[in-house]
Amino acid sequence: MLQPKRTKFRKMHKGRNRGLAAGADVSFGSFGLKAVGRGRLTARQIEAARRAMTRAVKRQGKIWIRVFPDKPITEKPLAVRMGKGKGNVEYWVALIQPGKVLYEMDGVPEELAREAFKLAAAKLPIKTTFVTKTVM
């Protein structure tokens, strides 16, 4: 699963997830899966979608993951009273704004890429759309 090798601080404030995304264009591959909604993706969700895509294209072509879970989410254990400090880091998330390209793919036909991204999108909690590279 994806997570940072090391961080300056172990825990983070909750913060807000506002604005529009940087990285809104298909940069590496020919096809992309772009977020339409706003939310957060856990490392497990990112990995599940990657596996679904890889299996769909039968390990041909190339896949790029354009998001990285760099925000720690803490949880307190069950049946523990409030107070006594912030909980332990349980998982890592990537904050997603509308317009962010999540995955890219190249080296496969468009129909196969569409099918693979459809399977991947089913694993994700946010609305997504299929995009192709625009040649200027």
Curated annotation (Swiss-Prot):
List the Pfam families hit by this protein, alphabetically.
Answer: Ribosomal_L16
Superkingdom is Bacteria
Task: Spell out the CDD domains in the cross-references.
Answer: Ribosomal_L16_L10e
Query: Which key words tag this protein in UniProt?
Result: Ribonucleoprotein, Ribosomal protein, RNA-binding, rRNA-binding, tRNA-binding
Q: Cite a single GO MF annotation.
A: tRNA binding
Entries under InterPro entries matching the protein:
Ribosomal_uL16, Ribosomal_uL16_bact-type, Ribosomal_uL16_CS, Ribosomal_uL16_dom, Ribosomal_uL16_sf
Cellular component GO terms, alphabetical = cytosolic large ribosomal subunit
Tell me which Gene Ontology terms the entry assigns under biological process: translation
Q: Which family does it belong to?
A: Belongs to the universal ribosomal protein uL16 family.
Q: How does it assemble?
A: Part of the 50S ribosomal subunit.
Function according to Swiss-Prot or TrEMBL:
Binds 23S rRNA and is also seen to make contacts with the A and possibly P site tRNAs.
The record's annotation in PANTHER family points to: 50S/60S RIBOSOMAL PROTEIN L16 (PTHR12220), LARGE RIBOSOMAL SUBUNIT PROTEIN UL16M (PTHR12220:SF13)
What name is this protein filed under?
A: Large ribosomal subunit protein uL16
Q: Which organism is it from?
A: Salmonella arizonae (strain ATCC BAA-731 / CDC346-86 / RSK2980)
Lineage, opening ranks: Bacteria, Pseudomonadati, Pseudomonadota, Gammaproteobacteria, Enterobacterales
